[in-house]
Amino acid sequence: MSMPFELIPALSLKAKVVNSKPLKKGDAVGYGAEYHAPNDGYLITIPIGHSDGYPFNGSGMRALVADGQIGHIVGGVAMDQSMIFVTNPVAVGTTVTLIGRVGDQSITMQDLAEHTQSSIVALMNDFAPRLQRIIVS
């Protein structure tokens, strides 16, 4: 549908890496050790989980790392944190984008809704008050 105006995304969800550790091919992580690393890489942890409103079934979603890497959430989304598998090392403190744009890559609320078989409205309503809101003009 054509609009008489441009729509600009008005929301992003970002977190800083709090832990980063190397993984070897076949290493298992997550609830029930259900995820096995497909190759050598790194497991980074961010402090956003389903108690923040990020969907419990968000495992497999892309995550955009500030250094240009694209990772995937693995091992299930925990209550207060999520783990992301990446190929190259990532420093603690690096920004990870779960919703938003980094360079020419983006993850939208629609992407998350489709992946989790939910709706944008339901996802928005689930975001917890403890998530910091920054209003920009």
Regions found by a protein language model. Give the residues of each.
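Active-site anion/phosphate-binding pocket segments in diverse small-molecule metabolic enzymes
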Residues: 1-137
